[in-house]
Amino acid sequence: MPETPRRFSRISIQSKLLLMLLLTSVLSVAVVGAIGFQSGRESLRESVFEQLTLIRSAQARMLEKAMRDLTSSMVVYTRGSTAEQAIAAFTAGYDELRDAEVPPERQQALVEFYQRNYGETDADADRDAAQARVQALLPRGNSQRYLQTTYTLAADTPEDRIELDDPGDGSAWSAANAQYNEFFRQVIKRQHSADALLIDARGNVVYSVGKGIDLGTNIQYGPYRGSNLAEAFKEAMNSNSLDEVVVRDFDTYQPSGIPTAWMVSPIGPAGNVQGVMALALPVDNLNRGLTFNGDWQGAGLGKTGETILVGPDLLMRSESRLFLEDPDAYRSDVVAAGTPVEVADEAIRQGSTILVQPVDTDAVGQALQGATGTLITEDYEGRRTLQAYSPVQTAGLNWVLVAKIDVAEAFAPVATFTRTLVLSTVAIVLVVCIAALLLARVFVRPIRRLEAGAEQIGAGDFDVELPVTSRDEFGDLTRAFNQMSSNLQTKERQLTEQRAENHRLLLSLMPEPVLERYRDGEENIAEEHQDVTVLFANVDGLD
């Protein structure tokens, strides 16, 4: 016989009953808990996915509306007479500056400005390379040198340059700036843009609100000829529609020092386009919308959720929530997830993840193929997240929008339920143990009484009658036991009476001494008595 069944057979009924009750209760709680856990997890997952989908859809609508509003505003600006008059005045003033005198000391100051801001850095130890870079950026034409020495060097901060209307040099360009600078300054303020440019038909940047190092340069032949702005300029100039607004995705733009996207629209009457107006896409304003102005929890994204915008190059077009909240934690997490250290350091150096942080995830890959859906996968921070994704195609841009939240946070109620279930199970087991112990004692009590009664009968005491305390099988068994005990008692009494009768009969046939010898096993008995002599006696049927 196997050892386990043998051991189990030696366990008392009370212990077996206790084990059965305990096992039944634990299995019941486990089954109910497992069903509740799975059902709760599925319901919660669907609820979170639905929430993420709603947020993603709302953000997509926000982006599409923002781009529509921007393109509509661009058409209004460029079709208005102010833009036409302004580009004509700035172009004329720009051409007039070709022969303007730029003192050598001002030219040297401009060179030093470029060297100080665009020359050697800590990461660039090659001075020759730094000097070559500065030389490539330095103004080539006299108009550019004049404007930058008069405006770019005249203010210490970009904000001061924007506010500078007239330095008092008496030039036609400064007169145009004094007249129109306020108009374009209000444009960038209303649109939350960093800069607005006017570029004539030849590609000269004849005006800039920010008056940075792109002021006066030629966008087709100068140092920024390979920029996204140059591409947008060419497309806008070749457009047959004055209502055309060309949008170019984010790309590095050295004059601003940050990734910049452009909206460009032609200026001038049909058939006589004078140039274009270029507006830097208001990235800060878009990011405020994408980051809910820092109130992610109020938007329903908890402590770890966010929405991110990704381009076809798999680089971010928005700011990372973790980067904004804790740059050190951002660096640690993304590097651990596979982002190169130098990329994470570059994001921290620039103070932005736009066009720096790669997001090569399953959700982004599927959305770039035109799919919309939800899934659970790792994000760019290496965390398991629930993600809702979709493509966002607006104004000619091919972006991907992802709303996500960490699995740990999303399923926190399930984890709480699991902990509660475990604690409840432990409590139930304890209660069941106590209840089972009491029930087992009640259950085996009739068996104990029967056992004691059987021992009495075995000891020869047939005068046993057990109390019948129930009407169940134990009651029936007790009644049967009592009946058996009564029968045995009757048999014993009858047997005793029969023995007494036999004894009297034998005494009537023989003397008592002879009877005793016969009972002791003697068969041939001869003995002399005064009253009678027994010669032979053969008694059959008597014990």
Where are these regions (language model features)?
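Extreme N-terminal signal-anchor transmembrane helix of membrane signaling/transducer proteins, especially
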Residues: 3, 7-42, 46, 50, ...
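Cytoplasm-proximal transmembrane signaling helix
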Residues: 18, 22, 397-402, 407-458, ...
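Membrane-interface helix-start motif
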Residues: 42-44, 286-295, 388, 405-425
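Intrinsic low-complexity, intrinsically disordered coil/linker regions enriched in small/polar
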Residues: 96-113, 208-219, 223-243, 285-391, ...
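Extracytoplasmic/periplasmic ligand-binding sensor regions of membrane-associated signaling proteins
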Residues: 146-281
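Short, charged helix-helix connector/hinge segments
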Residues: 449-469, 476, 515-517, 523-524
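Amphipathic coiled-coil signaling helices used for dimeric signal transmission
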Residues: 456, 469, 473-498, 504
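Catalytic NTP-binding/metal-coordinating core of nucleotidyl cyclase/transferase enzymes
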Residues: 501-503, 521-543
